[in-house]
Design a protein with these regions (language model features):
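Short beta-strand/loop segments at the ligand-binding rim of alpha/beta enzyme cores
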Residues: 44-54, 104-115, 134-136, 155-171, ...
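Active-site-adjacent beta->alpha loops and helix N-cap segments on the catalytic face
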Residues: 82-102, 119-126, 141-165, 170-181, ...
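N-terminal capping/small domains of soluble enzymes
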Residues: 1-113, 277-280, 288
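Alpha-helix termination/capping residues and helix-transition junctions
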Residues: 8, 71, 130-133, 159, ...
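Short glycine-centered, acidic/aromatic-flanked micro-motifs in structured strand/loop junctions
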Residues: 56, 116, 141
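Glycine-rich phosphate-binding active-site loops on the catalytic face of alpha/beta enzymes
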Residues: 71-87, 136-146, 185-203, 233-266
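Catalytic cores of alpha/beta
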Residues: 65-66, 123-131, 165, 171-189, ...
Length: 291
């Protein structure tokens, strides 16, 4: 074992020191951003969104969440257990809504990403792409340090060169670089930092989120790729700190889990209503999706 002696920081360890600003009002701040990437043929692609994205979890990565967020400029990564027919129905509805509002047909769908696991086939992606334009896909795995993840990224990139590929999760520069060179456009940063995640408690694996973002963002940006902070945000200021640390996107789970559009079961306790929130590697999630 090697002990890392450098100070490692989390969101609650720092504050943002103010600086001079040319802005007269917060209303002048442009919160939309256009993200660009190119495939092996050099063809440039892009999408525009407010770079805050609902996590691809059973509670937050729901179709109802995708409808509301995408229409308001935000993003949603659908949880991986949706059938392609359900996603196609969602995209059809969003496209119809966009046309009725005199917007580009992909105005809303560009902000909704699919999710696959490391052992999943590409059938669902193929079925959706037959019917609609798909902007991005998340390759989701609890341990982004498995060597076979690199092979999976290469497979997705080879078959779908036009897709914006998000891969995670990692917390160090070396694997960030490896996955980008394999074909990833964006890395999800964070292990054990999520509200529903018990990785740190059960295995002792993880890294303070702010330091992870800083280092991984530096590595990714040198290769013209992006990073997505995933986990650890409990209050709005944490989102601000993640962006200041270099995150291009911020993924939210717990902060959205109580919304009406979230998928958790509602229950009442001491006269107050709550929604169930669970991690995707939890016993509850495994029993729900795999029996």
């Amino acid at each position: 074992m090697r002990i890392i002696e450098e100070t490692q920081l989390d969101f609650n360890d720092v504050l943002i020191q103010p600086k001079r600003s040319t802005l007269s009002s917060r209303k002048e701040v442009e919160i939309y951003r256009t993200f660009t990437w190119s495939n092996d043929n050099g063809l440039m692609r892009s999408f525009t969104a407010i770079p805050i994205i609902a996590a691809n979890m059973g509670v937050t990565g729901t179709i109802d969440m995708a409808k509301v967020l995408s229409k308001n400029g935000y993003m949603c990564a659908l949880e991986k257990h949706y059938a392609s027919s359900e996603i196609n129905a969602l995209f059809e509805e969003l496209q119809q809504d966009a046309m009725h509002e005199d917007k580009d047909i992909c105005e809303y769908t560009q902000r909704v990403f699919m999710t696959i696991g490391i052992n999943d086939s590409f059938d669902a992606i193929r079925e959706v792409k037959k019917e609609h334009h798909l902007t991005g896909v998340v390759i989701d795995i609890a341990n982004g340090y498995q060597l076979k993840l690199i092979d999976k990224v290469k497979e997705v990139r080879n078959e779908f060169p036009e897709l914006f590929i998000v891969v995670g999760n990692v917390v160090t520069e070396d694997v960030t670089t490896d996955l980008i060179l394999a074909g990833a456009n964006c890395l999800k940063i964070g292990i054990g930092s999520g509200a529903a995640c018990t990785t740190r408690l059960k295995t002792g694996v993880g890294r303070p989120q702010l330091s992870a973002i800083i280092d991984c963002a530096d590595a990714a940006h040198q290769l013209h790729a992006y990073v997505m902070s995933d986990g650890g945000c409990t209050v709005p200021s944490d989102i601000c700190k993640a962006f200041c640390a270099g995150a291009d996107f911020v993924m939210l789970g717990g902060m959205l889990a109580g919304c009406d559009e979230a998928g958790g079961e509602t229950f009442e306790e001491n006269g107050k209503k709550f929604k169930q929130y669970y991690g995707m590697s939890s016993k509850y999630a495994q029993e729900k999706h795999f029996g």
